[in-house]
From Swiss-Prot:
Domain of life: Eukaryota
Subcellular location, principal: Golgi
GO biological process: one example: plant organ development
Subunit structure: Homodimer. Interacts with XXT5. Interacts with FUT1, MUR3 and XLT2.
GO cellular component, one term: trans-Golgi network
Name the record gives this protein: Xyloglucan glycosyltransferase 4
Cellular compartments annotated: Golgi apparatus membrane
Gene Ontology molecular function: glycosyltransferase activity; protein homodimerization activity
């Protein structure tokens, strides 16, 4: 082939992806570098154009796939008919307005217009654009700024009231510690030598499709140190999986063979969620033989001495209706999300529950790890299905009937924290929408009740309004909406003590019950503001009876508190399989064999040091639209603050925006399998 010839090869006549230009090295013929024919140049341009089109096509295809994947995972946890869409539209509107305002301010900044001077003489204004900008400044100062200032002052007052309440609670806790105040037994209530002196106790374990944890809760309840003839365990299974029902039945039968007084109960008509399950169980004829009832959720594992530390407090105290124990968490150090949850719940139990129990003899029942006097339940109307917070409902009604509560801070029951943000968000939505439902329903009863005026005031203003309504309202409105808007309205700028000093002080108070969490002070402050959108949305849905307020979603469990050696677990499962050879349990035996084989394979794979890779479930990231919208709103406001050199305002908005971004992309906690 001649040195200056060009050969064009194509695998397919309609595809130029394999087109090649074969020619000699131009550097060998410096005198012929410029002798390129028009045909060669055309082929060269065609090749470059094809490569560019291929690259763009690949990018478009990748973007489409990512959008389709994100659309599939966006807010799958929300009801399509819920009012959350209205909140999202509001956030989008604020974001669009802030972007437009930022664009205007950027132009004004580089044009070197005076951003603060409003009353500028008309003869100094040059051009229609600058005149329009000055007109906007005047309109903003006269009409928009006063409204934002009034709203910010109102939220600031609420913020200070709530901060004062938090400070008073901490002082009350300090007084309890200083004076060593704690519930004490006035007399020897139980003769340990005489089993007949032990009162009759009913144990209830409600569960629904909780495969990961049913064994540990049933096992822990079956090992409670109490005379076998003075205790009955009800396993209240609302699972809709027939295979799981068989497994739970088998676990119950295993403990029954060991002499434990335990029964399995499954409802054919599963209505009312947990409240309906408990209500149905209390209608059994044998319940009238029992004096107390203890409730444990499926992931709770009490110590054997739980009943001996709680039930004796009822002796000689006929007005006592509830004894509540503290929660402890087996997975509190699992990830950042569980660490931040631990801070909140440590404050709740160490401070809120303890102070209210000592000074008021009233607090919200936590739904589990508590002992009720059955008479108190019956006189208060029993379990009602009208809200998603049946525990708080029965506690309020019992308080209105004059029953007293005791909280035991030194009696702990181990449980799990949600490890994924999706599970935590659903839990928090239920915990914050239910109280507002309950407040609407209970307000007439509170007003008409015969309790003292100060107890009524505590219920209405502190228990419901301040801690359940005002807290999520001001935290979302002040820090997520007003603060970023004030960056575009300098007349309404918030002082530093509101956005920095007081929040840090309150966060320090929250961390005091868990001092090991001090390094997470800043992440905790940012995350609490991030969760305000979920709590605010839940509060609104509960207050105005939106559809999402009636949703009950069982919090996903991982069973970490029951993890043990896989070989021991496989051996236990194989023994169960051999023991159940009856014809009626053939299906169960097959299921046990399959699970044993799977566990055995997993053990072998681990023992081979990774030579055989186990097939893992695919984990996906959810995309939370409202959190992402607020992230971009705060980052836009941070950019505006940067132009004005606001310092701490900029850093707060920047890190708060990044916090919303991390949560919106589901980068905190475990992903969903």
């Amino acid at each position: 082939m001649a040195p200056n010839s060009v050969a064009v090869t194509m695998e397919k006549p309609d595809n130029f992806s394999l087109l090649e230009i074969n020619g000699s090295d131009p550097s060998s013929f410096p005198d012929k570098r410029k002798s390129i024919s028009p045909k060669q140049f055309s082929w060269f341009l065609l090749l470059k154009a094809h490569r560019l089109i291929s690259c763009l096509s690949w990018l478009v295809s990748s973007v489409k796939k990512r959008i389709a994947f994100s659309a599939k995972n966006i807010n799958e946890e929300e009801d399509p008919k819920s009012r959350g869409k209205q909140m999202y539209r509001f956030i989008k509107a604020c974001l669009v307005i802030s972007i437009i305002a930022l664009s205007i301010e950027i132009v004004a900044h580089f044009k070197k217009w005076n951003l603060d001077l409003i009353n500028r003489p008309s003869w100094e204004v040059y051009g229609l654009v600058e005149w329009s900008y000055m007109a906007w400044l005047s309109f903003r100062s006269d009409y928009i700024a006063p409204l934002v200032i009034s709203l910010s002052r109102f939220c600031t007052v609420l913020f200070l009231i709530q901060s004062l309440d938090r400070l008073v609670l901490c002082l009350g806790c300090f007084w309890i510690k200083f004076k060593k105040i704690e519930p004490k037994l006035t007399e020897e209530s139980i003769d340990l030598e005489d089993p007949s002196s032990f009162p009759m106790v009913l144990i209830q374990i409600p569960m629904c499709n909780e495969r990961e944890v049913y064994e540990q809760s049933i096992g822990a309840a079956s090992q409670l140190d109490w005379p076998k003839d003075r205790i009955l365990i009800q396993v209240l299974d609302d699972s809709d999986d027939p295979n799981l029902q068989l497994l739970i039945k088998e676990e119950v039968s295993v403990w029954a063979e060991k002499g434990v007084n335990i029964i399995y109960r499954h409802r054919l008509i599963r209505t009312g969620y947990k409240a309906g399950n408990l209500k149905s169980a209390m209608t059994c004829d044998y319940v009238k033989d029992y004096e107390f009832v203890t409730i444990f959720d499926a992931d709770f594992t009490p110590n054997p001495d739980f009943l001996k530390k709680t039930v004796p407090h009822f002796k000689g105290n006929p007005e006592l209706g509830l004894v509540q124990a503290r929660w402890s968490f087996v997975n509190k150090d699992e990830n950042l999300l569980t660490r931040l949850q631990n801070i909140n719940l440590c404050f709740h139990f160490e401070v809120e529950q303890q102070v209210n129990g000592v000074f008021l003899n009233f607090f919200g029942f936590n739904g589990t790890a508590g002992v009720w006097r059955i008479k108190a339940l019956e006189e208060s109307g029993g379990w009602l299905e009208r809200t998603t917070v049946e525990d708080m409902d029965i506690a309020v009604r019992a308080h209105l009937n004059g029953w007293k509560f005791i909280y035991l801070n030194d009696v702990e029951v181990t449980c799990e924290l949600p490890e994924s943000y999706e599970a935590y968000k659903k839990q928090q939505h239920r915990w914050h929408s239910g109280p507002m439902q309950l407040f609407r329903l209970c307000l007439p009863s509170i007003i008409k009740s015969k309790i003292s005026v100060w107890k009524k005031a505590n219920l209405i203003f502190l228990f419901f309004l301040l801690r359940k309504l005002i807290l999520p309202f001001y935290s979302f409105t002040l820090f997520c909406i007003i603060l970023p808007l004030t960056m575009f309205i300098p007349e309404a700028e918030l002082p530093l003590w509101i956005i920095c000093y007081v929040p840090i002080f309150i966060s320090l108070l929250n961390i005091l019950p868990s001092p090991k969490s001090f390094p997470f002070l800043v992440p905790y402050l940012l995350f609490e503001n991030t969760m305000s959108i979920t709590k605010f949305n839940a509060m609104i849905s509960g207050l105005f009876q939106f559809g999402s307020a009636y949703e009950w979603v069982v919090t996903k469990k991982t069973g970490r508190s029951s993890e043990s050696d896989l070989l021991a677990f496989a051996e236990k499962e194989e023994k169960l399989h051999r023991r159940n050879s009856e014809s009626g349990l053939e299906l169960l035996s097959k299921l046990k064999e399959q699970e044993t084989n799977l566990v055995g394979q997993e053990t072998v794979k681990k023992s081979l040091g990774g030579l055989m890779r186990p097939k893992n479930k695919k984990k996906t990231n959810m995309v939370f639209k409202k959190e992402l919208g607020l992230a971009f709103l705060l980052l836009t406001a941070a950019a505006r603050s940067f132009l004005s050199a606001h310092g701490l305002h900029f850093y707060f908005l920047l890190f708060q925006g990044l916090s919303f971004l991390v949560v919106g992309l589901d980068l905190i906690g475990e992903q969903i399998s």
